[in-house]
Amino acid sequence: GYAENMAKAAAKNLPLFLSSTMLYRRETQYIKQQVAEFGKPVHYIYHIGQYLPDWHPWENYKNFFVGNARTGGVREIFGIDLPWLLDTFGDVTHVTVQEDSISDLGLPYPDCVTLLLRHASGAQGVLAADVVSPKAVRNFECFGDGLHLFWEGNPKALYEFKDGDKRFVNTYASFEHDSRYSDNIVENAYVDE
């Protein structure tokens, strides 16, 4: 468990941290750079979801960590995505939470959670995470007076609206993808991490 891993890391004088794969995605790095260069408060809307039985179709979702209330699928999504959001928009100063269960998955935790986040930078965001979306989705939109970014979660779908045009932003010369997973899972970030 956690205590055992922490003890092993301490014995070897190694840091122990949650996966921060999204910090290594070139799309999130680009978004962070653009927000920093913009220099004014922005708002964002971010929806991440995927039907839980499709996460690992080769095994029953109730038999691995996402079926457990303590380590469930929605918590996993937050654990993956909050690090890059905090890195990009700053610490959260206020949060409002709405939870719901709208599926027949029989989970011991809410299958849909929506957060309204206020960041120290002045940014405000809506973060919706779910384990019921029939299609795996990672849709992000960030906007301010003079900035508008769109990202559909994969390397072929990052855009910025500039001078009246929606323009593709190419952040990868090439990328690795395992066909067993959704198109928003890119192996490059795992290697970089």
Which residues does each predicted region cover?
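Rossmann-like NAD(P)(H) cofactor-binding subdomain of soluble oxidoreductases
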Residues: 1, 17-24
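Rossmann-fold NAD(P)-binding glycine/threonine-rich loop
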Residues: 2-15
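Short catalytic-loop micro-motif centered on adjacent basic/acidic residues
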Residues: 16-19, 126-128
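Predominantly a Rossmann-like dinucleotide-binding segment in NAD(P)-dependent oxidoreductases
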Residues: 22-98, 103-106
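Short aromatic-enriched loop/helix-cap "lid" or pocket-rim segments at secondary-structure transitions
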Residues: 28-30, 53-60, 107-110, 138-140, ...
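Contiguous beta-strand/loop segments that form the cofactor/metal-binding neighborhood of enzyme cores
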Residues: 77-157
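C-terminal glycine/acidic-rich active-site capping loop/insertion
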Residues: 145-193
